[in-house]
Amino acid sequence: VLGLARAMARELGPDNVRVNCITPGLIQTDITAGKLTDEMTANILAGIPMNRLGDAVDIARAALFLGSDLASYSTGITLDVNGGMLIH
């Protein structure tokens, strides 16, 4: 999907069409509710610099940003929304 998005960004850029990706970290949703024990949650949070799980609003805000004029010169990018979980 990421490669396809980059290819589309390159192809559609001349037409002023922006194509970007959002890669979410662990997000609290109805699907994840009740699945993580306290110990599992503590272990996960230990690896997230922001010390919390994400929620749907975090992803929605990223999408709003990418769709706004604030990101008017951004195309072909991957925006990690994971609280810093994948900092290398």
What are these regions (language model features)?
Residues 14-17, 77:
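Active-site loop of short-chain dehydrogenase/reductase
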Residues 1-11:
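Conserved catalytic helix of short-chain dehydrogenase/reductases
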Residues 64, 75-88:
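Short C-terminal tail/terminal secondary-structure segment
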Residues 5, 60-63, 67:
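Short-chain dehydrogenase/reductase
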Residues 48-59, 70:
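A conserved structural motif in NAD(P)-dependent oxidoreductases
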Residues 34-48:
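A short C-terminal helix-loop "cap" of Rossmann-like NAD(P)-dependent dehydrogenase/epimerase domains
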Residues 10-14, 72:
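Alpha-helical segment proximal to the catalytic Tyr-Lys
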Residues 10, 20-34:
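Short, flexible catalytic-loop segment of classical short-chain dehydrogenase/reductase
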